[in-house]
């Protein structure tokens, strides 16, 4: 736990350059005066984070904007964004770096900020549980505000009933910064736990380059909301279930028999 301490006014640990691997460390309670404290502040180089826990930090991991930096997050847990503040604390916030891979990790109990937000050039979000859960009130569950290449495969992405924002996955809200803008969603389960209709995936076509590619394949949506009807692109094999068809609170994502 940080216990009010930080490195360089930024984080519990600051990774400035080089090739690093961090394993089996728990990062808690990171705060700094500007509201952007982090468990890890990753600035440049290559970093792999494996089997770590990030809890009650202003940001779990926060990166800088060096376009040659690469971040991999494997089998880690991000939870419990701080409350009692007007700041937007993201559990994982990735800046304009070369690449991001997040695999086998869990994100839950956000508050006003996002569970995972990335401005990276290339993104691979694979086989994770982004489930805001009871007591969570994150904004977006997953956002790529500046586009880029984003592969989102095999995740369970679940929005809390207490979320103030209907969008579950967002792409390109601030336009397309990168030369390649491509969103592929496949084999994901997207859940709305509230009674307000969700926007399961929103891509801002008017703000993105005309050659932007959006493809969805074999995704399952659960609960009220719009998916491909409000999403331009190529869509195949997606299926919708009504509210209550799954039991996210019990981590039961088996669909009913038909």
Mark where each language-model region is.
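Glycine- and acidic/polar-rich repeat regions and solenoidal domains
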Residues: 2-16, 23-257
